[in-house]
Every structure is written in structure tokens, then in C-alpha cells.
């Protein structure tokens, strides 16, 4: 052992390479006085929707909140109580947490050698309302005809930039955690979908139910600084 220390992340090196650009745009946002819900947020959401070949994108505080938004929305769309969601055995705990917090019963399915849900091991004797697909380490989730008639939700925190950003789910949760594919220097997430009702639900959820207050929500907005970065 020669005492060599290898950094766990390369965030410092990345920041040093982008420092001038990051500081310039951060200063621009702060000098504008528009710290939330401004042009950078709108531009980033528009870019995300186009990048993912989807109609809509809504930013939020984190990938975990993006999953919660999706889970709560689809729980309200079903008469089954509690609805059941199947998630892969290999995923971060936030995937399960989001659905449990939203009132779902979570069933765990074993994975294949790539860490993705193995359709051969899916529970056939259960009534399932949603399948949650997770692509780990940048590996795209598999587009299988098995999913064609079911509610499919993608936890895209680690894989959304793969497979040319083609989405196969009804909705996808994205994360911009500093350790993710596209990172912010803080927290951030987004919901990507073609569902206009989900878009409106997400916008209300992230802003304490405003403006109609027909649904409850919380403060889960992504700041202008993080969107600009």
C-alpha cells in the first residue's frame, strides 16, 4: 500500500472545469431577483420534454419527490385500495419509499443479471396496478411487449440519458442529484410525461396546491439557480 487516496467522486474536478460558467450564470440569476419559476426554469423544462421525446416536463425538488408525485397521481386514478406496485429488488430505497408514502402496496420482483426486473419472475397471481422499471448504472430499461397494456412508471434517476432518451413508461421520474447523469450543484428532479392531467397535478403538488387547491401539495420547486446550471 502506498497511501494513494482516490477521490470517491469527481465533483471538485468537474466544478473547476465549469467554475466560470457556473458563477456567471448564478450571478445573473441572483442579480435578476427572480429566484424561482423564472425563464431558466421554463427553458429547462422545455428542453427536458424535447430531450425525452415527451410533451411535458415539470421540475421539482428531487428525484424522490418526482416519484412521489407520480405515485400519488396514479393512486388517485384507481379504485383499488390499496393499489399494488411491483418494483425490482435492485433499486435505491427511494423507489419503494415514494409508493409506500403515497399509499401503495409494494411488491418486490427479482432481477436478471443486469439488475433489471425479470419478467419471468413477476408475480402472476397478483392484481398489479403499476410496474416500476429502474435502469441502474446508466443501463436503459428494456422495452418489452409485456409492458404494452400496463401502467409503466420509470424511475429514471440513473438511466434517463441512455437509449437516446426514449421513454417507455406513462411517466418518468428524473433526478439531478450531484451524483446523477445530469447534475445540479444542489437538489433537483423532474416528472416527464405525455399526460396533461399529470402535468397539472405535478405543478400544483410542487407549489402547495396552488392555484386551485383542489389537491394538496408541498413546497417542492427547483430553483432558478439549479435550472440555470
How would you label these PLM feature ranges?
Residues 89, 107-112:
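Short beta->alpha connector loops at strand-helix junctions that form conserved
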Amino acid at each position: 500500500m502506498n497511501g494513494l487516496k482516490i477521490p470517491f467522486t469527481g465533483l471538485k474536478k468537474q466544478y473547476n472545469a465549469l467554475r466560470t460558467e457556473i458563477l456567471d450564470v448564478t450571478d445573473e440569476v441572483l442579480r435578476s431577483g427572480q429566484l424561482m419559476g423564472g425563464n431558466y426554469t421554463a427553458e429547462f423544462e422545455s428542453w427536458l420534454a424535447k430531450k425525452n421525446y415527451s410533451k411535458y416536463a415539470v421540475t421539482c425538488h428531487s428525484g424522490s419527490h418526482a416519484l412521489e408525485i407520480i405515485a400519488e397521481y396514479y393512486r388517485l386514478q384507481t379504485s383499488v385500495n390499496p393499489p399494488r406496485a411491483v418494483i425490482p429488488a435492485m433499486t435505491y430505497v427511494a423507489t419503494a419509499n415514494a409508493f409506500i408514502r403515497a399509499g401503495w402496496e409494494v411488491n418486490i420482483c427479482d432481477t436478471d443479471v443486469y439488475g433489471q426486473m425479470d419478467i419471468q419472475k413477476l408475480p402472476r397471481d397478483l392484481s398489479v396496478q403499476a410496474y416500476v422499471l429502474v435502469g441502474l448504472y446508466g443501463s436503459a430499461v428494456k422495452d418489452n411487449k409485456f409492458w404494452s397494456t400496463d401502467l409503466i412508471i420509470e424511475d429514471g434517476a440513473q438511466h434517463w440519458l441512455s437509449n437516446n432518451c426514449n421513454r417507455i413508461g406513462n411517466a418518468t421520474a428524473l433526478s439531478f442529484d450531484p451524483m446523477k447523469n445530469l447534475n445540479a450543484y444542489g437538489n433537483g428532479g423532474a416528472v416527464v410525461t405525455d399526460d396533461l392531467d399529470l402535468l397539472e397535478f405535478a405543478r400544483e403538488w410542487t407549489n402547495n396546491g396552488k392555484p386551485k387547491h383542489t389537491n394538496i401539495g408541498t413546497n417542492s420547486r427547483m430553483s432558478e439557480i439549479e435550472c440555470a446550471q
